[in-house]
Amino acid sequence: SEPTMSTRVQQATSCVLLIIGCTNYAASKQQTENNAVCDTPCKCLGRLAVQKAYLEGALEHARQSIKAFASSSRQHTIAAGATNTKLSGHHPNQGRRGRRRSSSARPNNSKGNSPSKRAGGAVRGETPASGRLKAAKLLKSSNYETATFTPTEMTIQNRRACEQVDESKEYRFDELNFDKEQGIPTPALTLEISMGCQKNPGDTGGACDGTNADDGVVTKLTFTTAAPVAETSPLVAGAYKKTSKASLSISNRTEEGRVANSKAAHEAAKRLMAIKQPSDLSTYTDDSSFALLVGQLAMKPPLGAELTPALRDQVNKFITDNYGANEGDFRSKFLAKTEQAAVFYLDGKSKKTKKISELESKSELVTASGYAFFKGIHTEQAEKVENPRSQGNPETAENKKEGGNTAKPFCSTIQNQTECEGVKGTPPTGKAKVCGWIEGKCQDSSFLLSKQFALSVVSAAFAALLF
């Protein structure tokens, strides 16, 4: 029976790495003949028209998505690369492997490749607050289009070698002429895929910034004898990433809801960074987006959840406790400490340390904010408190010294908020109380210290971006 299109695509994917292209790609007549006799993809190994159509459809959503939040993505790409946080969850689909397009094979929206014309997964009726929450998620969500290259073994076919192949020559996808009689002439020859998101024209204009309709994903194929490598990188980085002996999988983000959410995140992020007076508390507290970001960082509601009245009260209390109740408190207690805080930033590939007040270039500010955000929100409680039942021993509890620090009471055993906040003793550095009523229970008040520090770095760096 006639193979299904899905079967054809899978067969073509498994076969495409077994072949090489000849330089006589100008022989359009031969390509046409190959397509005409394509009983099965593995027989003719070509059918470029079909492959290119799938290719353009698979990657059009990537171009659209990148354009939707390119400026924000560009600002956070380096910071994202500095973390161990998994930015993108990929679910490779065998039926979509091997689909890639060249710089000369731009998608044509008139052919139905636009995400707005695709069905499925639409998320509608979002409130403005929900849209602003996307700003927080943008920095650590799966909104990065990532090309994942998976190394695979190549099987050498006992077929006539293509005498015209130049092993170091680079080919565009549409230049390859897949000849059904040709296989890989040498086990050392590998297919190298290089991919990046580039400004028009092609690979000479730098990284995508979403300002040109022709910006998009660019793919190069090179036949080489280079050693196998495999990498994963955000396409928005601009720089090409290479792999060999590999197939290419692109995350499928064609649903309208993903595109809409990405646009909302982009707009929300721009509002968050539009801070005019970084030394004024009202600059932050008057912005509902900032409260949403605090809630996402400190209170950790489920992704996509709105701030309920109870949660909003907790957020407001957290802001008052950590940022100050008035302008004077904010400047003397919070801003002064923030400016003196030491943070990590990236200088090229090296991780370095500076005080926030000494960060100079926009790159330093962006990487510092991203590093603090990604690392800070995942930091566990740094120091465990001790059980107050050990107070009977003069060598423990309040009398016990370790490195000059007084041991703390076991806050989590206290069930009453008033009693919790009234515990006497030496509070953790930077905190007003020993214990705090946090997320509906009594906890060591240093519990949110790392989150507050991360938040302070993010706030200061965002503000400084404007200067």
Swiss-Prot record:
Is Transit peptide a UniProt keyword of this protein? no
Q: Which domain of life is it from?
A: Eukaryota
Q: Where is the lipid attached (GPI-anchor amidated aspartate)?
A: 444
Pro-segment residues?
A: 445-467
Annotated membrane topology is: Lipid-anchor; GPI-anchor
The answer on whether this UniProt entry bears the keyword Lipoprotein reads yes
Residue spans of biased composition, Polar residues class: 77-87, 107-116
Please classify the protein's predominant subcellular localization into one broad category: membrane
Glycosylated residues in this chain = 108, 252, 416
Q: Where is the composition biased (Basic residues)?
A: 93-103
The annotated region (Disordered) lies at 77-133, 382-407
Per UniProt, subcellular location reads as: Cell membrane
Q: Which UniProt keywords apply?
A: Cell membrane, Glycoprotein, GPI-anchor, Lipoprotein, Membrane, Trypanosomiasis
Q: Which Pfam families match?
A: Trypan_glycop_C
One GO cellular component, as annotated = plasma membrane
Function per UniProt: VSG forms a coat on the surface of the parasite. The trypanosome evades the immune response of the host by expressing a series of antigenically distinct VSGs from an estimated 1000 VSG genes.
Kindly provide the name given to this protein in its UniProt entry.
Variant surface glycoprotein 7
